Curated annotation (Swiss-Prot):
GO terms for cellular component: cytoplasm. Transmembrane segments: none annotated. This is HTH-type transcriptional activator RhaS. It comes from Klebsiella pneumoniae subsp. pneumoniae (strain ATCC 700721 / MGH 78578). PANTHER family: HTH-TYPE TRANSCRIPTIONAL ACTIVATOR RHAS (PTHR46796:SF13), HTH-TYPE TRANSCRIPTIONAL ACTIVATOR RHAS-RELATED (PTHR46796). Activates expression of the rhaBAD and rhaT operons.
């Protein structure tokens, strides 16, 4: 597995914050690093496999990666990221208590993926631009300025995360996408789901297309297929059982969609043939 080292990203040993844009981010194999990062998805879509679990990400997704987490990107489509790197929550020179603003692991569950709306994303871009404008100077004022801006970024992300009440269409769409991650196997009526989150069907189609590049049904199919691929790799259930468990009513249709998405059949994945060639 690839290991990324802080010495390659932080311009000097004294630096505590760094910005690494990926415009775009292509598919990247599984890796981990000896630093922490906040991944901000600017636009496009892709699959983020985090500690073995697949997540569909798009514009407004925010991912919190710790130094012991492993992750990879695949099936990227114009996926543009900004990576905000920091050495560790307790490694700042002028900040204390940073960990209180980060996701907290409870009973083995680490809420690594948040979403913010497009208005907040613009504010995030502004703060990131300010951090970049400070440059890589290592004098006291530059280090302090970068850390202050990093704290502003954390506060903004925390206040704007899904814990906040949905007050506009962007926030409602983000909550709908989070809901789909947990209810993907259900039979979905898009009119009912849109109404559940106080969206018109037309608004749902338009905003989801803008944020992910996919129609609602295409997005749902991708989520279902990613969950199915994970089960094929990590369970002993039959292909048919996995198809039904992931919301597909017909195993033949499931196999057709699966091959179209991944260029491998479910049986190929079960036998690990894709891993052999990677």
């Amino acid at each position: 597995m690839t290991i990324l080292h802080s010495t390659d990203f932080f311009k000097a040993g004294i630096s505590t914050v760094a910005i690494e844009p990926r415009l775009p981010q292509s598919a990247f194999p599984e890796h981990h690093h000896d630093f922490h990062e906040i991944v901000i998805v600017e636009q496009g879509s892709g699959i983020h496999v985090f500690n073995g679990q697949p997540y569909t990400i798009g514009g407004g997704s925010v991912c919190f990666i710790r130094d012991h987490d492993r992750h990879l990107y695949e099936h990227t489509d114009n996926l543009c990221l900004t990576n905000v790197l920091y050495r560790a929550p307790d490694a700042f020179r002028f900040l204390a208590g940073v960990s209180q603003l980060l996701p907290q692991e409870q009973e083995g569950n680490y809420p690594s993926h948040w979403r913010v709306n497009q208005t907040v994303l613009q504010q995030v871009r502004h703060i990131v631009a300010q951090i970049e404008a400070v440059g890589s100077d290592t004098d006291t004022h530059a280090v302090a300025s970068r850390e202050i801006l990093f704290m502003q970024l954390l506060v903004l992300l925390r206040k704007s995360s899904l814990a906040e009440e949905a007050t506009n269409n962007d926030a409602r769409l983000n909550q709908l996408l989070a809901w789909l991650e947990d209810h993907f196997a259900q039979e979905i009526c898009w009119e009912e789901v849109a109404a559940q989150f106080s969206l018109s069907l037309r608004t749902l189609h338009r905003q989801l297309k803008q944020q992910t590049g996919l129609t609602p049904q295409r997005y749902l199919n991708r989520v279902r297929l990613m969950k199915a691929r994970h089960l094929l790799r990590h369970s002993d259930e039959s292909v048919t059982d996995i198809a039904y468990r992931c919301g597909f009513g017909d195993s033949n249709h499931f196999s057709t969609l699966f091959r179209r998405e991944f260029d491998w059949s479910p049986r190929d994945i079960r036998q690990g043939r894709d891993a052999i060639l990677q």
